[in-house]
Design a protein with these regions (language model features):
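Beta-sheet-rich non-transmembrane sensory/scaffold domains
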Residues: 1-178
Length: 178
């Protein structure tokens, strides 16, 4: 469990309470289990009845339109120019074989837990959002030429308040979307 994203703060001996299986697929003697809120896939050996491994899925670089614009039929065209990171957070899952290899396909669904504790760990990036590292805020300001956290820029984007602090100093060094 050391490498899993555990969104609710607990004492280490109780971290297992926040591992939440979502979907399961099987291939031979293995069951693959999506752990959505933990942003991981677990592997369970069916005959041995034991967990073999968990694979944290990390963060993915994304280019999206996080603005408050509606797109082609609205006030302006979609502008895919916002660079953020996203959590895959796998939901449904299937497996298939090609030759001797097993592959997994997931439908990813970034979503904070519905509990009050986890909902506090997801905020809009706007004016009252999470604290940003000053150098990161400056880079965003240079990119947007104005306040990057206006709704017309990144302000409406729902971000994690725990996944973008890459240096552990308490502020976000990268925006990580759900």
């Amino acid at each position: 469990l050391e490498n899993l994203r555990i969104p609710v703060a607990r004492r280490p001996e109780y971290r297992y309470l926040d591992v939440e299986p979502e979907f399961i697929t099987t291939a031979r003697d293995l069951a693959y289990v999506t752990l959505q809120e933990n942003n991981a896939i677990g592997v369970f050996h069916l005959r041995k009845r034991a967990w073999v491994k968990t694979y944290p899925l990390g963060r993915l670089p994304l280019v999206i339109d996080a603005s408050d614009r509606d797109g082609p039929f609205g006030s302006r065209a979609i502008a895919l120019n916002d660079q953020v990171h996203g959590l895959p957070m796998p939901d449904s899952l299937t497996s298939f074989r090609i030759g001797s290899r097993t592959y997994l396909a997931t439908a990813n669904e970034g979503d904070p837990l519905s509990s009050r504790k986890d909902s506090m760990r997801a905020k809009r990036a706007g004016a009252h959002g999470p604290s940003l590292d000053p150098s990161y805020r400056q880079r965003l300001k240079e990119r947007y030429g104005s306040d990057p956290l206006l709704d017309a820029n990144l302000g409406r984007l729902q971000v994690s308040t725990i996944d973008g602090d890459t240096d552990g100093d308490g502020d976000l060094d990268e925006l990580t979307a759900f």
